[in-house]
């Protein structure tokens, strides 16, 4: 097993996740099987109870793991299916060690950070790195490990020490370190001092970088590269220029141009890994396909405007998978994506009194959009604005997609506007109102007292119901009888109201295996009005966009029927690579 660690210095949020994913993707172009692990040095067990405004999106895995958003990047770039164990947190590893101590596994020893916690981290990495994650079912050849946060912070100290020991445990030829640093541009001059200080700090902790990936707003000058190489004790070929590009999908090609993969190939002796000719050819085809697909970002195309009506619009990372699913779909439809970020509260009548400018700007974005999207979320804030946006889409025949909360919002709006039940709402927001007005109810099997890990999580089947041959979403899925998508919710549509809703035109075309829990709703006489209880964005890939999102973009661009008929499929045929 070969290990490539990606760490960061100077500041967090510098792009380690994209660089780690891009490095893994380049490894795949050699025909290698690649897996990935993310280390998050926070005390939370997982990301399930963290605010999206503080830490970005919570990404849900097949096994129900609620993880850091970077695992979504890994799955999208590498075409793999990870597990909750591929995300190591401080809380998770401490709980593991404490549980072992309680069992008596340490035989009366004084349990310490070194060696017990650091050994547990190393054992965890070695165990998880061997888990098959792709369709071959075989053990991976390479494991990419991203160390979250910033090296030097007190939170990451145990993990840095564990990795320092780990490099000797696995051997130099099996361990490489890429350190991502910031090169700011001040008054037109590229400054290297932050990178010099970061590398000095890294070396003082016992880790020596094999490559330094320099993040900069512009292309690095040769004198800057030479200066970093000289003062950081590396060769110029070990300094990689990772400047801003118009799409993160270009980063693998940027690294390829600078021969990063050639250096790692020699440094890790990758030629010692036995590969079949079929695997090598598969890697070459992957690279060719990636170049062809990402090239769509550079072409001049018609623009499709999607109004994203959300609650966490101040931090775009809160909706990272949604953004990526829209990007994947727009590439397939050969359209330029223009997301209009609409804060849901700005659509509400109260906003007209408190801030008329924001109110009119928000409604202008909604009313001029080609399509409207309401993504997932929790809590009552902004829900009335979402209801108004859903009504606008329904009444004005604007393509609409609701996800999780979006499905519940669409149902509440329909119940109020069409059924005439003006007081209808969700038990999540108003638990004390008359139960007959609860359109959305708490699922009976869910623990009401515990927040963390208590939702309906992970990959679950949805079955298309009888007499739904007309359904656009069913056609987008290829007229299959069932689909498997990832879930994350505590509330569901009130089963007692389903018959009345369907009799008035709101059809639940997809339900769970019991036939009672509603998973997909659709309006029959509408260009595209779809909502899902599950989160289809979590399984979207570059060459295989999420079908509900693809339908939204296609309908918004006026090409839905062409997309359903396969006229926008890749000329080369099927996606062999699952990314």
From Swiss-Prot:
Presence of the UniProt keyword Ribosomal protein in the record: no
Annotated InterPro entries: Class_I_gatase-like, CTP_synthase, CTP_synthase_N, GATASE, GATase1_CTP_Synthase, P-loop_NTPase
Active site residues of this protein: 404, 535, 537
Protein family (similarity comment): Belongs to the CTP synthase family.
Subunit-structure text: Homodimer. Oligomerizes to a tetramer in the presence of its substrates UTP and ATP.
Name this polypeptide is given: CTP synthase 1
Annotated organism of origin: Saccharomyces cerevisiae (strain ATCC 204508 / S288c) (Baker's yeast)
Further facts: Present with 57600 molecules/cell in log phase SD medium.
Function: Catalyzes the ATP-dependent amination of UTP to CTP with either L-glutamine or ammonia as the source of nitrogen.
Superkingdom of the organism of origin: Eukaryota
Transmembrane segments: none
Cross-link Glycyl lysine isopeptide (Lys-Gly) (interchain with G-Cter in ubiquitin), where in sequence: 422
Gene Ontology CC entries for this record: cytoophidium; cytoplasm; fungal-type vacuole
